[in-house]
């Protein structure tokens, strides 16, 4: 692999799921999707389902932190503001995603999630 190729990172678009090749030195500059122009590494928490979870996580080299949650879960709701704060703090360095375990049982099962919390 050439030095130029090694300096690029693949980032999945949270909007259209397209894989984007971004210069690693420019990750903090707010890169946008080449297909739909959506921000790739903003501070938002991305909500994914069974289908989009696999596509998103397989198309990105950026670390992804996943919150498997459920709307009826009190501790999950209590943690949500802290998860969002962490996403803002680490914007550009990691992607934070939420997966509703009730609506995405396949994604939850792949990671051994059997109960919430």
Predicted segment positions?
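Cys/His-enriched microdomains
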Residues: 11, 31, 71
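Short linker/helix segments within small regulatory modules
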Residues: 22-31
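A short beta-strand-turn-helix
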Residues: 45-64
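Thiol-based oxidoreductase modules, predominantly thioredoxin-like and allied folds used
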Residues: 48, 68, 80-106
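Thiol/disulfide oxidoreductase modules built on the thioredoxin-like
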Residues: 107-116
């Amino acid at each position: 692999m050439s030095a130029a190729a090694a300096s690029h990172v693949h980032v999945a678009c949270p909007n259209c799921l397209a894989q984007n090749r971004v210069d690693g030195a420019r990750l903090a500059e707010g890169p946008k999707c080449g297909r739909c122009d959506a921000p790739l590494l903003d501070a938002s928490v991305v909500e994914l389902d069974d289908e989009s979870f696999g596509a998103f996580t397989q198309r990105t080299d950026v670390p992804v932190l996943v919150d498997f949650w459920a709307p009826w879960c009190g501790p999950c709701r209590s943690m949500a503001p802290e998860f969002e704060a962490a996403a803002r703090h680490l914007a550009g360095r990691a992607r934070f995603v939420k997966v509703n375990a009730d609506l995405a049982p396949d994604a939850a099962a792949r990671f051994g999630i059997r109960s919430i919390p």
